[in-house]
C-alpha cells in the first residue's frame, strides 16, 4: 500500500513538473506571437522597406520618392536585394508593416515616436512657409509677422504649426486641410499648393520635405522659408531617423553605421528632392555638404 502511495505521489509530481514546463513553453510561444521576440527576424538577404504607395516626396510604388532612393542606396551598401512592402501611411501603418514582420525598416521615422525604435537621425528639417515669389510674403520668416494677420494661410489641421498660428491670431483667415487621409486617393500638400497657385490662399504651411518638393515642382517655383524663428508655440524643427523593431538592436547598429558612412550621399538625395535641410543651429545645409567625403 505504501509503495502504491509513493508511486502515485511520484506520478503527480512528474505530471506537475511536465505541466509547469509545458506552461512555460506555451507562455513563451504566446509572447512570441504577440511580438515580444527575443531574437531578430531581419531578412539576411533582402532589404525589406516599409513604405507608402503614394506619398511623394517620400515614396510611391513606382520608386520615385527619396525614401525609395535611400532604400536603393542602402541595399547596394548592404549587398542585399531590395523589396518594398507598401501600405498607406495612416492609422495602423507601423502595426501592419514593421510590427507584422512584413518589412524590417521604415525609412523616415521621427525621433521620440514610441511606436518603433529609432536609429540615429539622418536629417533635420522644419515646417516651412510657402509663398509666391514677389508676393510680399516671400521674406516672412516667422508666424509672428504682422503681415500674415490679414492673409489667408493654408494649414494641415492638427499639425504643430496650427498651434503657433492660433497663438498668433492667424486662425480666423486660415484654410484647413485634413491630416488623416488615405494617401492612395488624396494629398493635402498637393491640394494646398494647387490653391496657392490659383490664388485661393496667400501662403501655406507644410512639413519641410513636402514644402520643398512641391514648391520646386510649381511653375514658377514657389519660395520656401523654414520656420525656425518661432518664440511662441511648439518647436517646428525635428530630427528624422529610421524606424526598426525594439528587439532589432544589431540591425539598428548596422543602420547607424550606414547613416554615418553615407551622410553626404544621403544629403545629396534629399537636396535633389528640395528638402530644406538644417544643421543643429538651424542653418541651411546646402549642396556643398553632399560633395564632402564622410
Model-based region annotation:
Residues 72, 76, 81-147, 158, ...:
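Acidic, polar ligand-binding/catalytic clefts
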Residues 31-32, 65-77, 134-137, 141-160, ...:
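Extended ligand-binding regions for polar small-molecule ligands
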Residues 53-57, 61-76, 129-188, 209-210:
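Bilobed "Venus flytrap"/periplasmic-binding protein-like clamshell domains
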Residues 2-11:
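Twin-arginine (Tat) signal peptide motif
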Residues 79-81, 99-108, 150-152, 192, ...:
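Alpha-to-beta junction loops
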Residues 52-53, 124-136, 216-259, 273-294:
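Periplasmic-binding protein-like
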Residues 30-32, 160-181, 256-294:
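Ligand-binding clefts/hinges and TM-proximal coupling segments of bilobed small-molecule sensing domains
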Residues 31-114, 183-186, 272-273:
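Extracytoplasmic small-molecule ligand-binding "clamshell" domains
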